[in-house]
């Protein structure tokens, strides 16, 4: 970097960042005081982020609504939705915006330099010169609005953020998290809901919304971040000349204030909604929470991550075990929040009896006191430190750019501390220090200081309340009816007119000439060839050994896969349970707690799961495997295999009390995930009506599996002997050498050792004769709705075009982008107010359309019905078509971590996708035009013809449209 030419900036700090092989620079913009960080390295996946401190003073969600709104057009890019245009037409590897409790971030990433420049330009223009001052409709669309179609009513609220937060406030886990933070920080910004409380969002006025932007969206309050291999001097010069230099320095009062400590712990009782089908008995949350210092102390923050693991995170961890043994809750877990100025630590019991609150607190304090007196298990500390350090060094964030995660982590310090801005990417010395301190009672001292002797905390009881959603809905309905009744005829007419004007604004198509202001790449900028797969098929005594030679920085990624093709249908749910049991029960040489610590102290972890692959060319054909995945540094390969053998060959299933604990935890977590990922739940269930693979997955991980687990938990005493027999038999039937395939990703130097270990492992697997009664999975179309206590819907419709005689085409990838960011986006998100909408098309023909946190139900299904007409009339000029093609390719050309390279190649192998097929798909994408898109209309009609629908949603919305369904059932029972 040519520092001499950067006359607009003052260099504050330059440091070698050895942990991430980079050089870090910290600047201050001289004219405005903007904070600027540049991290130089050879990473081609370049990242830009601009963040602002945005502490809310209430729970109207102004920071969140503003985050949505500034991306709805700006001075240089006066479109209605430049964000969507970028998604459709850039090679971005990340493009989004996020609201946190005290900051708002606008990050982008791309490997293409021109594309990166374009993204940075649009985002800078959006935050500094948004169209929100010219178009009140933006605020009304993204935040909230009165919706009144005629003067007689009814009057309702709508808005993207309003509906998003209605969904968020429907999740008890989210409600608990908010209530805990509010209980610990009642007098500062963390006592407010930055995302917005649906009850308070309509209190926000347009002028208050604009004032928030005027106050906080100024360079003097900004934190600008650049990362990767780029001309930093050029980028910083652009940022100065185009934006920062136009502003003067301004004192922005955005400092995050600290909550004064409490004299004694606060004791609070709150409530959350449950459906009528759900029990109020033993369904409370108990939370013991304490403030644990501040985010600027990297040593303490990292130490608390380790303590979270050692006390609560690991199976068999002492605090977790004590609470489970006392049957305080069906699930016990902890969390450590260090993404805000004042950090805090929680101990949470879910599925608890509120009358046992005192006992809950007493056990926590007794166990912690004993731990302080007797010392923490050294192996647990070693495992916790190694676990955190392995993850930090590996830096595998899947499809998310490394620089993005580094930048967001850096803000955890930088936002509050200009002195140590790079602390989050300089943690190796911290891990080394913790290894020194683990035998010096440092961790015990933290427990005593923060968890026992600390009065700045809260004890929160969150109780279930049947009918709470209905009472709130009735109160809102009455409030809006009263408001409508208070208006005179002129005011009502004006409200109807504003509704019409907003709809007109939303329905007005983007001017093609205006759209050209968004800079765009050319088709020639796109690589023509696919990234080759890395599959080398080897053989070990008859077992397929799929080797992926990839530079992995000394880490080996192992996947032992046992084919379950002959598994009878009635055993599939037990397969789903087995993945949660193995590795979490006692073995011949370890208790389950010792087993976890041994694995995490010596390796990067071992995890069991089930992998499913649908065949690319054969309809309804799929392969499924019970998998044991592990990762380790090459020198510890023998330890990894030793621990895998311990799990597969010596796991004890006789401890039925432990099995019941696991089942209760699986049930508890499924209750949360089925609702929070309601779109995935609904899609899988709808697909299971006609797809054997989806029916298999539903029985092993979806609604059918939850129903199996719920029954097993309720009738455990009667079923426990059968359960032990079924799991034991399943292991004998599955864990056999003839069913074993291996996928391994690593460098050549590690291969011979892994092959030797696999060869030895095969000899230890079950080889006795077994009889398996094969029974294929049957599908049954049901068209179901599953009711929840929530206030929004997840509406899914599925089908299979291959079964109707249509072939797969690469153009379907483009259609997915066009639907998600044009037709569905406009009709379901913009006009309908849903938070999200998605579609998908697989080579097997399986296809879906789904909405996310949607206030509607039947209206959304009607939107789906209109898709064929949209496709039939699809008419994009060359520029628009190129945009869609670029946006489609960006989703396929995401930079791959070493682990991803192996996984993608493995998936292609088992799905029967060759490089020739992948290249054909890419060619079809690159050569697509409007005609090839229009040709997909009959295919989409065939998908919708199946009329397979599933909805996860609120009781009132479902009951209003119950004639659409064959079955209406509660999602959660008991």
List each language-model region with its residue ranges.
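Generic recognition of flexible, low-complexity loop/linker segments
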Residues: 94, 210-214, 273-276, 319, ...
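Non-catalytic, conformational "gating/processing" segments within enzyme and secreted inhibitor domains
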Residues: 158, 210-242, 723-758, 945
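His/Glu-based metal-binding/catalytic segments typifying zinc-dependent metallopeptidases
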Residues: 40-42, 49-51, 162, 166-170, ...
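Non-catalytic terminal extensions that flank enzyme cores
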Residues: 1-47
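Hydrophobic, small-residue-rich alpha-helical packing segments that form membrane-like cores
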Residues: 150-221, 225-243, 247-275, 280-282
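Active-site His/Glu-centered metal-binding helix of metallohydrolases
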Residues: 62, 66-70, 578
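Extended, regular secondary-structure scaffolds
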Residues: 211, 223, 232-251, 374, ...
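M16 family metallopeptidases and their MPP-like homologs
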Residues: 45-55, 81-129, 136-147, 174-199, ...
